[in-house]
Amino acid sequence: MTLSKAGVLLIIVLALASTLPAQTQTLTVLHNFTNLPDGGRPAGRLLLDPDGNLFGTTTIGGKIGYGSVFKVDASGNLSIFYSFAGPPDGNDPVSGLIRDAAGNLYGTTAHGGTTTVCGTDQPSWAGCGIVYKLDPSGTETVLHRFGSNGPDGGFPNGPLALDSSGTLWGSTQVGGEAGCTIPIPPNGRMVDVGCGTVFKVDASGIESVVHSFTKVDGAAPIGGVVQDQALNLYGVTLTGGLQNCPHAFFGSCGTVFKLDTSGQFSTFYSFKGGDGGPDGDIPESSLILDPAGNLYGTTNAGGSVQCDPIHLPGISCGTIFQLTPAGEETVLYSFGGSEAAGFPTNGLVRDAAGNFYGLVSGLVLKLDSMGKESILYTFTGYDIIASGDLVQDAAGNLYGTTYYGANGKGTVFKLTTPPDFAVAAFALSPASVPAGGSATAPLDIITVSGFNDAVRFTCSVSPKPAQSPQCSVTATAGTPATVTVSTSGPSVRVPSRSGASFSYAMWLPLLGLVGIGGLGSKKRKVKAMLLGCALCLGFASLVACGGGSISSGNRGTPTGAYTITVTGTSSVATGSLVRSTSAILQVQ
């Protein structure tokens, strides 16, 4: 038995009726587990292969009783791909699977490998787990057996990552450096189980510990690791880090860690404890990445909403968070509002349109790209204990498992999702213009789940000073739409002239010229002087009367950065879906 998630924070399944209207989606149960011989109580994220087959694990049952790896083909037929046998094989495979290009599967079991009790006096904790490989025929190879709470770690419970050299990366919840003492049931005896590790297993099967946690930099890593395009590894620790969460083990709030390509470990983010505030704490799900390198995950507590002030005072309901590649965190959503859900323990899946889907409190939730939540499906009975993370196919269908349900041994299900779209990100060309210049960009939409509707585009500019940029969207059937942003250039204004004063100012030098012309030619110097005086007097009169002043008029679009937001609306008559995206235009 691993460190229970419920041991860190009492997990309450909220049985409240939701005040949000549930969307009509179709759920199909693909298989009801019976324990023997097919397995029971599935856990971990399902794996979807290129042929549409699903692979997953059950923590009990199978042909021998120690858990199984199962396969559900594209027609919905389930078969047992492998049954665990217990030590020296593994048992209790709680993590999901990964697949290499050759079709081999890799995973971990939380227990088994050896018959040695793993760090406690509980026989059920025999063996610290294994790393295994299954070839396409279902033949197993044990790549590594973890020691008895030793320096190499124990209780791996999250998915692995596989790099291009064939090296596997993962984490163990205990083992490694000493310093993490927990109470062990049934008598609560305190045992130092170690703070957990990050490990690797190379292509030849040699395991090495890359980092041992110290509680200060995190403890009890959970959810495995993910790898970005630059080959950096990321994961979460259930606790450790900042001492600001009295409801968690060690009073710590949890962390997100990073391991770069040189092997350098760093605490990427330390949760601050957000009960009644914006931040979350106690992350216990796997992370996911988007194409831009942003990380997303959930926290089991924290956020801005308290779920049960009477029974759990001061404990908020959890969050969905984002971390940029620079380590800047944003809470995208706080649980516990109108959707009557909280304390998420599962991770997320994100579609191409930027929508998130997850299992929490017996609900399948959607958080759209605009940050609005909706309920896609509400489980009933034992099915409310959903296990593992969802996975999505190219058509937008979601697949997942429930831990109990049906025969009390769990199910595999498929759920349709509603059609949706997103306005694709755009970049203006040029991105910087002088006042009076213009920029354009092609627009497109990203569709998911069979979206097939007309989209009407509008655009807006912020801020909006006098002479702010103007934007418009043009579209021709069958071609991408175009957004055009134009700015105003400076202009010069010459004020109007008063008729009488202007006439006086003009006649004065003319009369002077006539008078001067009557003087003799011998008085040329005097004539020149008088002519100059007349011209100066006339010009002075012209300016004084407003006839010759020149002032600045329209100064054009002020310099600065402007946010250009394009909004797409589908089903124009009802306004059912509104999606937007933005770009920056710099005016020099």
Regions found by a protein language model. Name each.
Residues T2-V423, A435:
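Extracellular beta-propeller repeat domains
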Residues P418-Q588:
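Long beta-sheet-rich domains in secretory-pathway and surface-associated proteins
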